[in-house]
Amino acid sequence: MNSIGIRGGVSGSSPIGELETQYFQEYDVMANWSMPWEWYSASGWGVGTRLMGSVGAVRASGDTAFVTTLVPGFVFGRKDGWLSLEVGGGGALLSQHRFAHQDMGGTFQFVWDTALRAKVYRGIGLGYWFHHLSDASLYGHNAHGFDLHMLEVSYRF
């Protein structure tokens, strides 16, 4: 494991053009593991792979659902984690998929994450995550996902 942290965020304008019918919030605890595939230059810059997992809660219109994610991805930046851009895609499980004004279709959802993360003091880091959950039409065209803008506080080992 190379980092642990907490994240929290809210839905907002989406750069991918989907409209949520709810205002969503998500809070979770996350962990990142380095995977063995990487290439870094002598200067320390390069690309690596990681596996990110999280457990937390999603809220909308007074409804709260348990959410867990598992997202493999790529890390672009310095090997020491001083600054990185992370991109990944994976899966999520929700304990409920119907909220007051929005049906997400089913328990399983696809996840797309993009994160900008930086160390700010010793092992302590801050990050911004764009977090997209949707069924990718797995449950039909009437289901809607959501996009979150999340902030992270983490500790890197």
Regions found by a protein language model. Give the residues of each.
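Transmembrane beta-barrel strands of outer-membrane/channel proteins
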Residues: 4-12, 49-57, 87-91, 126-132
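Predominantly the C-terminal beta-signal and adjacent terminal strand-loop region
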Residues: 15, 114-157
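Mid-chain, structured segments of secreted extracytoplasmic proteins
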Residues: 40-77
